[in-house]
Amino acid sequence: MYDQVTLGLNVDPFILSALKEDITSEDVSTNSVMPDSTPGVVDLICKEDGIICGLQVFERVFTLLDPSTRAEFYVKDGDHVENKQLVGKIYGDIRVLLCGERTALNYLQRMSGIATYTSQVAALLEGTGIKLLDTRKTTPNNRIFEKYSVRVGGGNNHRYNLSDGVLLKDNHIGAAGSVAKAVQMAKEYAPFVRKIEVEVENLDMVKEAVEAGADIIMLDNMTTEQLKESIDYIAGRAEIEVSGNVTKENIARLTGLGVNYVSSGALTHSAPIMDLSMKNLHPVE
């Protein structure tokens, strides 16, 4: 789980990799029109309503290129912003502002998009007592940014990586031979402080998971009727998570059923970006 402090401690290798992807040897466009260092300033402008997220990462792109670059933000992560709003100003060598522009905006747009979409989904669960969770369906090498964005948007992080908890999915069950066998083996291997979660797809698997002593049962890709039947059978003997193609458009059907958690891969794999841009770049004395 990452907050602004731990995010700042871990992002540099990923940002440097992104910069190296975009600036292999030089920025030939910038160097052709700006051969010498010239101080400048540029506006960061929001082009649609949403939740801003990733300002620290945005600024870090530029300070990795030149530590003297500085940003002046008028909002903070988690704030609601509106179309045409001035979010901040960035001061530094014009060559640095131009070289880092696309990489910095890519992070900010992606992170703000995830935070915005998550906030919209979380609003649909407000007052229900259901926790909204993300998944590991993230962009490779961007998980730290995407899971942080989910939290900023009002969601909660499920496992960050495979070391964080036991989640026995269909292929684990297939490898073990049965739900009961998979749960038994996990209980024998995992430390006693770790909860055992198992993914099930039908009532027979639900029954097996309950009898095996699973701590959390994930009801995957079930119809509303199957969910009701499964929840009635579990009857409080395990925590309940619902998953499987959960989106902003269909999550409302899961309220009022008595589930503890709803996980949605859409928070990270289907959130549209939020449109932001850097405008009005000009030299300063």
Go through the PLM ranges and name each one.
Residues 259, 266-267, 280-284:
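Acidic, glycine-rich flexible loop/linker segments
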Residues 221, 244, 265-266:
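Short secondary-structure boundary segments
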Residues 2-212, 216, 225-233, 239-241, ...:
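Acidic/glycine-rich phosphate/pyrophosphate-binding loops and surrounding catalytic core
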Residues 272-281:
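Structured adenosyl-cofactor binding patch, chiefly the S-adenosyl-L-methionine
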Residues 236-240, 281-285:
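Short acidic, glycine/proline-enriched helix-loop-strand junctions
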Residues 248:
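Cys/His-rich Zn2+-binding cysteine-cluster or related metal-binding knuckle/ribbon modules and their
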